[in-house]
Amino acid sequence: VKPAPASKPEVKPAPQATPKAEEKQAPALEQNPQMHVNMGAFDTPHMRGTRSAIMSNINGWRTLTDNMYRSRVLQQGEPTGIWAHVGGGKYSFNGNGVDTDTTYTRIQGGYDAKTGSGWTIGGQVSYLRGNDDYIFNGSGKEKAFAVGMYGLKDLGNNQYIHIESQVGRASNDFTVRNEIGEKLSGETKTNAYTIGARYGKTVKLSNGTYIEPQAQLSYTHFGGDSFNAGSMHVDQSGVSSTVGGLGLEIGKHFGAGNLYTRLGVNHVFSGTVKTTYTSGATTKYTSEDIKGTWTDLAFGGRYGFNANNSIFADISTGLSGDYKAGWSVNAGFTHKF
């Protein structure tokens, strides 16, 4: 068995030790010098970049749907009616070879009203756009869209429950690169849905001050996708995950508004993203465990100009975790006819 000719510059050694001649790896690379999936117990930079794009898409959907934002401000005293909310921020994910940073803008709007049964119910539309950064100057453009319904009810004894469901679609148009700048471009898009519930109890103190422990549980299914990135074919499995959260809010009501600070800890109990990559005659597999814990801190408030018009705003930041919100700023208004 002759070794691969040294005169062909496009033949690059495998990232690990030089393969034995009987493995015949060099001839395979010669036949396809643009191969993006190589034999061995490792993933190539193009595979790693594609994993980053998939994880960014999942985290974009999570950012769009996980906080039950409208129910929270209604609980704090916001009037029902037509409302809109715009926000922006950053989040990152770092783990298992995936390293992503995303800057995003989120817009939500809807309408809600009180019913005779004691529930406040509403419908909403949500949209997110994000720009991703990956290893070796890779990049992605995220888009996520969802429609949903929500409701909240006073259970008595200063207790409440919030419920919400959202269904929509998320996509990521990405370009990934390896160490020498060779790039692959592709687009992954899939359907997703989320349902969740939150329980809280308000402990009223003196002078309008309160303490409010909260517990939240949500379930998300993020669909699978099959797509091409250059000459590499990718099959991503669907993933289902359950997320639980505990929070403690401390605030103060004053006149027509309130101020608060909230500390939260969240944990993903389940979820594995399984992906198959094929380039030429070579196929490899990766399995991404998305279980983990993260914490966040928020400050915010609301103010009512009159019975029909009010504003609300908050700023939050992540404190720890593989999934970490760098910062987020949100503001909105409600108008009641």
What label would you give each PLM region?
Residues 1-35:
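Cleavable N-terminal export/targeting peptides
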Residues 29-211, 316, 321:
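Outer membrane beta-barrel translocator domains of Type V secretion systems
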Residues 82-84, 121-123, 147, 161-163, ...:
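Transmembrane beta-strands of outer-membrane beta-barrel proteins
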Residues 89, 128-130, 218-220, 264-267:
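Short, internal active-site loops enriched in acidic
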Residues 96-102, 137, 171-189, 221-242, ...:
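Solvent-exposed, glycine/polar-rich loop segments of beta-barrel outer-membrane systems
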Residues 171, 201-203, 217-223, 254:
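Short, well-ordered alpha-helical segments in soluble proteins
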Residues 205, 234-337:
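Outer membrane beta-barrel transmembrane domains
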Residues 206-212, 222-226, 255-259:
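Short, structured loop/turn "capping" segments at alpha-beta junctions
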